[in-house]
Amino acid sequence: MRDRPYTLLSCSVSIDGYIAGVASRLLLSNDADFDRVDAVRASCDAILIGATTVRTDNPRLLVRSDARREERAARGLPESPMKVTVTRRAELDARADFFRVGDAEKLVYCASPWVAAARDRLGPVATVVDAGDNVEMRTLTTDLAARGVDRLMVEGGGTVHTQFLTEDIVDELQLTVAPIFIGDSEAPRFVRDGTFPWNPARRAELVEVQKLGDVVLLRYALSSRFQEAERGDGC
Protein backbone atom coordinates (compact mmCIF):
# COMPACT_ATOMS: atom_id res chain seq x y z
CA MET A 1 0.00 0.00 0.00
CA ARG A 2 1.25 3.48 -0.84
CA ASP A 3 1.94 5.85 2.05
CA ARG A 4 -0.43 8.41 0.53
CA PRO A 5 -3.16 8.43 -2.16
CA TYR A 6 -2.61 9.42 -5.75
CA THR A 7 -3.51 13.10 -5.46
CA LEU A 8 -5.16 15.15 -8.19
CA LEU A 9 -5.68 18.89 -7.69
CA SER A 10 -8.51 20.37 -9.78
CA CYS A 11 -9.26 24.08 -10.07
CA SER A 12 -10.90 26.63 -12.37
CA VAL A 13 -9.28 30.05 -12.65
CA SER A 14 -9.69 33.32 -14.51
CA ILE A 15 -7.06 34.37 -17.04
CA ASP A 16 -5.42 36.46 -14.31
CA GLY A 17 -5.32 33.57 -11.84
CA TYR A 18 -8.29 34.19 -9.53
CA ILE A 19 -10.74 31.53 -8.36
CA ALA A 20 -13.60 33.81 -7.26
CA GLY A 21 -14.72 37.40 -7.00
CA VAL A 22 -14.58 39.47 -3.82
CA ALA A 23 -18.29 39.69 -3.10
CA SER A 24 -19.71 36.63 -4.83
CA ARG A 25 -19.00 33.34 -6.57
CA LEU A 26 -18.25 33.44 -10.27
CA LEU A 27 -19.06 30.87 -12.94
CA LEU A 28 -15.62 29.87 -14.19
CA SER A 29 -16.65 26.61 -15.88
CA ASN A 30 -19.21 25.57 -18.48
CA ASP A 31 -21.41 22.51 -18.94
CA ALA A 32 -18.71 20.51 -20.73
CA ASP A 33 -16.19 21.17 -17.99
CA PHE A 34 -18.72 20.45 -15.23
CA ASP A 35 -19.32 17.04 -16.83
CA ARG A 36 -15.57 16.40 -17.06
CA VAL A 37 -15.14 17.26 -13.38
CA ASP A 38 -18.06 14.99 -12.52
CA ALA A 39 -16.29 12.11 -14.26
CA VAL A 40 -13.10 12.83 -12.34
CA ARG A 41 -15.03 12.91 -9.06
CA ALA A 42 -16.62 9.57 -9.87
CA SER A 43 -13.15 8.07 -10.40
CA CYS A 44 -11.90 9.10 -6.94
CA ASP A 45 -12.23 7.63 -3.47
CA ALA A 46 -12.34 10.97 -1.66
CA ILE A 47 -12.73 14.69 -2.36
CA LEU A 48 -11.04 17.24 -0.12
CA ILE A 49 -11.81 20.94 0.33
CA GLY A 50 -10.86 23.49 2.95
CA ALA A 51 -13.18 24.78 5.65
CA THR A 52 -13.36 28.21 4.00
CA THR A 53 -14.71 26.60 0.84
CA VAL A 54 -17.32 24.73 2.89
CA ARG A 55 -18.43 28.02 4.46
CA THR A 56 -18.38 30.26 1.38
CA ASP A 57 -19.47 27.91 -1.42
CA ASN A 58 -21.60 25.42 0.55
CA PRO A 59 -20.84 22.63 -1.98
CA ARG A 60 -22.55 19.24 -2.00
CA LEU A 61 -19.61 17.41 -3.62
CA LEU A 62 -21.78 14.72 -5.18
CA VAL A 63 -21.43 12.75 -8.41
CA ARG A 64 -24.21 14.22 -10.54
CA SER A 65 -24.49 11.71 -13.38
CA ASP A 66 -26.99 8.89 -12.77
CA ALA A 67 -24.89 6.55 -14.92
CA ARG A 68 -21.73 7.28 -12.95
CA ARG A 69 -23.48 6.81 -9.62
CA GLU A 70 -24.89 3.50 -10.84
CA GLU A 71 -21.47 2.39 -12.06
CA ARG A 72 -19.95 3.15 -8.67
CA ALA A 73 -22.76 1.28 -6.90
CA ALA A 74 -22.22 -1.72 -9.19
CA ARG A 75 -18.59 -1.79 -8.01
CA GLY A 76 -19.74 -1.86 -4.40
CA LEU A 77 -18.83 1.79 -3.80
CA PRO A 78 -20.93 4.63 -2.39
CA GLU A 79 -22.64 6.66 -5.12
CA SER A 80 -20.31 9.59 -4.37
CA PRO A 81 -16.79 9.66 -2.89
CA MET A 82 -15.95 10.31 0.74
CA LYS A 83 -15.99 14.02 1.65
CA VAL A 84 -13.00 15.44 3.52
CA THR A 85 -12.38 18.89 4.96
CA VAL A 86 -9.66 20.52 7.04
CA THR A 87 -10.12 23.08 9.80
CA ARG A 88 -7.96 24.70 12.43
CA ARG A 89 -10.68 26.13 14.66
CA ALA A 90 -13.74 23.97 14.00
CA GLU A 91 -15.69 26.90 12.57
CA LEU A 92 -18.09 24.75 10.55
CA ASP A 93 -21.87 24.47 10.51
CA ALA A 94 -23.30 20.96 10.77
CA ARG A 95 -26.21 22.14 8.61
CA ALA A 96 -23.95 22.83 5.60
CA ASP A 97 -24.67 20.80 2.45
CA PHE A 98 -21.21 19.24 2.78
CA PHE A 99 -22.53 17.36 5.83
CA ARG A 100 -26.26 17.26 5.18
CA VAL A 101 -26.46 16.03 1.58
CA GLY A 102 -25.46 12.56 0.42
CA ASP A 103 -24.68 9.27 2.14
CA ALA A 104 -20.91 9.29 1.66
CA GLU A 105 -18.65 9.22 4.71
CA LYS A 106 -17.55 12.66 5.94
CA LEU A 107 -14.18 13.29 7.61
CA VAL A 108 -13.09 16.49 9.34
CA TYR A 109 -9.37 16.87 10.10
CA CYS A 110 -9.01 19.37 12.93
CA ALA A 111 -6.09 20.96 14.78
CA SER A 112 -5.58 19.34 18.19
CA PRO A 113 -6.61 22.31 20.39
CA TRP A 114 -10.05 22.42 18.76
CA VAL A 115 -10.85 18.72 18.37
CA ALA A 116 -13.17 18.58 21.38
CA ALA A 117 -15.15 21.57 20.10
CA ALA A 118 -15.32 20.03 16.62
CA ARG A 119 -16.65 16.75 17.99
CA ASP A 120 -19.28 18.56 20.03
CA ARG A 121 -20.42 20.50 16.97
CA LEU A 122 -19.96 17.97 14.17
CA GLY A 123 -19.92 14.57 15.86
CA PRO A 124 -23.44 13.60 14.72
CA VAL A 125 -22.66 14.32 11.04
CA ALA A 126 -18.96 13.52 10.55
CA THR A 127 -15.92 11.72 11.91
CA VAL A 128 -13.56 14.27 13.47
CA VAL A 129 -9.87 13.32 13.28
CA ASP A 130 -7.14 14.88 15.41
CA ALA A 131 -4.66 16.20 12.83
CA GLY A 132 -2.04 17.52 15.25
CA ASP A 133 -1.16 21.08 16.10
CA ASN A 134 -0.07 22.11 12.59
CA VAL A 135 -2.45 20.08 10.35
CA GLU A 136 0.17 19.06 7.80
CA MET A 137 -1.28 17.72 4.57
CA ARG A 138 1.28 14.94 4.25
CA THR A 139 0.21 13.54 7.61
CA LEU A 140 -3.43 13.90 6.61
CA THR A 141 -2.94 12.02 3.35
CA THR A 142 -1.07 9.25 5.14
CA ASP A 143 -4.11 8.81 7.37
CA LEU A 144 -6.41 8.79 4.34
CA ALA A 145 -4.32 6.05 2.74
CA ALA A 146 -4.66 4.00 5.93
CA ARG A 147 -8.44 4.44 5.60
CA GLY A 148 -8.38 2.91 2.11
CA VAL A 149 -8.27 6.06 -0.01
CA ASP A 150 -6.19 5.31 -3.10
CA ARG A 151 -7.20 8.29 -5.23
CA LEU A 152 -7.80 11.76 -3.76
CA MET A 153 -9.24 14.81 -5.51
CA VAL A 154 -8.42 18.23 -4.03
CA GLU A 155 -10.84 21.01 -4.99
CA GLY A 156 -9.78 24.10 -3.06
CA GLY A 157 -9.48 26.67 -1.94
CA GLY A 158 -6.29 28.67 -2.30
CA THR A 159 -4.87 27.92 1.14
CA VAL A 160 -5.38 24.18 0.68
CA HIS A 161 -3.90 24.32 -2.84
CA THR A 162 -0.84 26.09 -1.45
CA GLN A 163 -0.36 23.57 1.34
CA PHE A 164 -0.61 20.55 -0.95
CA LEU A 165 1.64 22.02 -3.62
CA THR A 166 4.35 23.37 -1.31
CA GLU A 167 4.46 20.03 0.50
CA ASP A 168 5.04 18.39 -2.93
CA ILE A 169 2.26 15.83 -2.53
CA VAL A 170 0.28 16.53 -5.72
CA ASP A 171 0.73 14.07 -8.57
CA GLU A 172 -1.51 15.73 -11.14
CA LEU A 173 -2.84 19.25 -11.67
CA GLN A 174 -5.95 19.89 -13.74
CA LEU A 175 -6.32 23.63 -14.29
CA THR A 176 -9.25 25.03 -16.26
CA VAL A 177 -8.79 28.60 -17.51
CA ALA A 178 -11.94 30.68 -18.05
CA PRO A 179 -11.98 33.54 -20.60
CA ILE A 180 -12.50 36.31 -18.04
CA PHE A 181 -10.46 38.68 -15.88
CA ILE A 182 -11.20 39.45 -12.23
CA GLY A 183 -8.79 42.34 -11.84
CA ASP A 184 -9.10 42.71 -8.07
CA SER A 185 -6.13 41.96 -5.82
CA GLU A 186 -8.50 41.38 -2.89
CA ALA A 187 -10.09 38.38 -4.64
CA PRO A 188 -8.95 34.84 -3.76
CA ARG A 189 -6.23 33.45 -6.00
CA PHE A 190 -5.39 29.91 -7.10
CA VAL A 191 -2.47 29.81 -4.64
CA ARG A 192 -0.99 32.03 -1.96
CA ASP A 193 2.65 32.93 -1.42
CA GLY A 194 4.88 29.94 -0.79
CA THR A 195 7.96 28.01 -1.81
CA PHE A 196 6.83 25.70 -4.60
CA PRO A 197 8.92 22.79 -5.92
CA TRP A 198 8.27 23.78 -9.54
CA ASN A 199 10.57 26.56 -10.71
CA PRO A 200 12.94 27.32 -13.61
CA ALA A 201 15.11 24.39 -12.52
CA ARG A 202 12.17 21.99 -12.15
CA ARG A 203 9.43 22.72 -14.62
CA ALA A 204 6.04 21.01 -14.42
CA GLU A 205 5.29 18.71 -17.36
CA LEU A 206 2.32 19.77 -19.50
CA VAL A 207 0.72 16.54 -20.70
CA GLU A 208 -2.60 17.69 -22.17
CA VAL A 209 -4.34 20.79 -23.49
CA GLN A 210 -8.05 20.43 -24.22
CA LYS A 211 -10.53 23.03 -25.45
CA LEU A 212 -13.92 22.62 -23.78
CA GLY A 213 -16.21 25.22 -25.30
CA ASP A 214 -14.89 28.57 -24.14
CA VAL A 215 -12.57 27.21 -21.42
CA VAL A 216 -9.22 25.43 -21.71
CA LEU A 217 -8.07 22.48 -19.62
CA LEU A 218 -4.35 22.37 -18.83
CA ARG A 219 -3.25 19.05 -17.39
CA TYR A 220 0.15 18.80 -15.69
CA ALA A 221 2.10 15.80 -14.42
CA LEU A 222 3.73 16.79 -11.13
CA SER A 223 5.27 13.46 -10.13
CA SER A 224 6.34 10.13 -11.59
CA ARG A 225 3.15 8.60 -10.22
CA PHE A 226 1.22 10.33 -13.00
CA GLN A 227 2.91 8.14 -15.64
CA GLU A 228 2.34 5.04 -13.50
CA ALA A 229 -1.36 5.85 -13.22
CA GLU A 230 -1.64 6.51 -16.95
CA ARG A 231 -0.05 3.13 -17.70
CA GLY A 232 -2.44 1.45 -15.29
CA ASP A 233 0.37 0.34 -12.99
CA GLY A 234 -1.60 1.54 -9.98
CA CYS A 235 -1.58 4.81 -8.08
Q: Can you say where each PLM-predicted feature lies in the sequence?
A:
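Enzymes that bind and transform nitrogen-containing heteroaromatic metabolites
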Residues: M1-C235
